[in-house]
Structures are given as structure tokens and as C-alpha cells.
């Protein structure tokens, strides 16, 4: 799973509890690797966000993370609140928490750098003819091969949104929908507004309200 929020991981985790047969979930990150560091070390700590080729994954804190913590802390919501209220000033050490070892054994993780993203995109399109976006590439590149097991990778975006990644990738132009090509050729228009609710509301009601 190319992960930018905890939500995707939690959905699959809940699905296994409802009967979906999964042997594990692999969490793929880009260079903003807060979750990879967590599953590698047991320490949840915030770092500075770094710009990458997979921009939707450029996070320093995983939203919805409390959902996993509820499981780790055996439904102790007061403890979850205490730890999160002190974060990110204080990192969270999961290693001594009751259910961490069991949960951590179900998840693996990886970190994919920008160059690895580019290489993965080129490899997949050359071998299969299928063009994946940079977020999906983190999952394809990061997930280790598993013998005699089926691997399901979640694709998350259309590659045409990321022309700066694919300019030198064969087959990119053919994968851009005509509607999107037409948008790229149009003149960009925008209006600058003051950072005030009243000004924004007036602009919307004056120009777009029916």
C-alpha cells in the first residue's frame, strides 16, 4: 500500500478482522518515512517534510494514526489521548506496549527514494506496457518478493498528473487522456482573495451560487 495516511492501512487491517484472508500488509513510503521508521524501530517520531516525486505522500505525521494506537494499547483511549497530546514534542516508543509485537509482525514497510521511483516506473512500463504513477511505484518497488504468495498492490493516481516524472518515459504521451491534454493547453486563470472568510464567501456567492 502506498501510504500517505493511516486510513488506508487501517481499512485493510479492519478487513482482516472481518474475515479477509491476508498474510500481511506492506506499508510503502517515499523519503518522508515516518511509518517506515516506526515499523523498523518501534519509535514514532516527527521529521521535517521533504519534497518528493510522490507529493501526496509528503507528510511528517500520519493522519488517523490514533486508530492503530487504539489496537496497540488494547482499547485504552485515555492512554492514546495522553500520548498524542504530547506528540510530536515527545516521540512515542511502541516497543514496550502490550500488543505492539503482534501488530508489528503483521506489517512490513519500506522507503523508496526518488531515483528508485523513476527506475521502477521505467521497469514496469518496459516489462508490461503499463504506466504506473510515482505513488504506486513506491509500493511496487518497496514490497519484497514473496515465494508462492499473491501480492496485491494498490494504485492510487493517474500518471498523467506527474509529467515532470515521465518526460523521458516511453509511452507516457499515449497514456494522457485527451481531456487532460486539452486542460494543459488552456490558459490558467485565478483570482487573488484576502484570507478572510467573508471575502471568500462573497466571491463564491457572487460568481457561482445559483
Question: Model segments located where?
Answer:
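Mg2+-dependent phosphoryl-transfer active-site scaffold
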Residues: 13, 20-29, 33
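Beta-sheet entry/capping signal
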Residues: 23-26, 129, 150-153
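Short acidic, glycine/serine/threonine-rich loops at helix termini
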Residues: 11-17, 36-41, 164-167
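Extended hydrophobic-aromatic, low-complexity segments
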Residues: 134, 149-151, 162-165
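Single conserved hydrophobic/aromatic residue that forms the stacking wall/gate
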Residues: 1-7, 11
Amino acid at each position: 500500500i502506498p501510504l500517505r495516511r493511516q486510513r488506508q492501512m487501517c481499512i485493510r487491517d479492519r478487513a482482516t478482522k472481518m474475515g479477509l484472508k491476508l498474510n500481511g500488509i506492506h506499508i510503502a513510503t517515499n523519503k518522508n518515512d515516518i511509518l517506515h521508521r516506526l515499523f523498523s524501530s518501534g519509535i514514532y517520531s516527527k521529521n521535517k517534510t521533504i519534497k518528493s516525486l510522490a507529493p501526496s505522500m509528503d507528510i511528517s505525521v500520519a493522519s488517523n494514526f490514533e486508530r492503530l494506537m487504539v489496537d496497540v494499547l488494547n482499547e485504552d483511549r485515555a492512554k492514546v489521548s495522553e500520548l498524542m497530546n504530547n506528540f510530536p514534542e515527545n516521540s512515542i516508543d511502541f516497543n514496550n506496549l502490550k500488543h505492539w509485537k503482534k501488530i508489528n509482525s503483521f506489517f512490513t514497510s519500506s522507503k523508496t527514494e526518488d531515483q528508485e521511483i523513476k527506475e521502477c516506473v521505467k521497469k514496469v512500463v518496459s516489462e508490461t506496457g503499463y504506466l504506473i504513477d510515482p505513488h504506486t511505484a513506491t509500493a511496487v518497488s518497496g514490497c519484497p518478493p514473496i515465494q508462492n504468495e499473491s501480492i496485491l498492490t494498490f494504485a492510487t493516481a493517474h500518471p498523467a498528473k506527474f509529467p515532470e516524472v515521465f518526460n523521458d518515459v516511453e509511452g507516457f504521451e499515449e497514456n494522457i487522456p485527451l481531456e487532460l491534454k486539452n486542460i494543459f493547453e488552456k490558459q490558467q486563470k485565478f483570482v487573488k482573495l484576502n484570507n478572510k472568510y467573508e471575502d471568500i464567501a462573497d466571491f463564491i456567492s457572487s460568481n457561482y451560487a445559483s
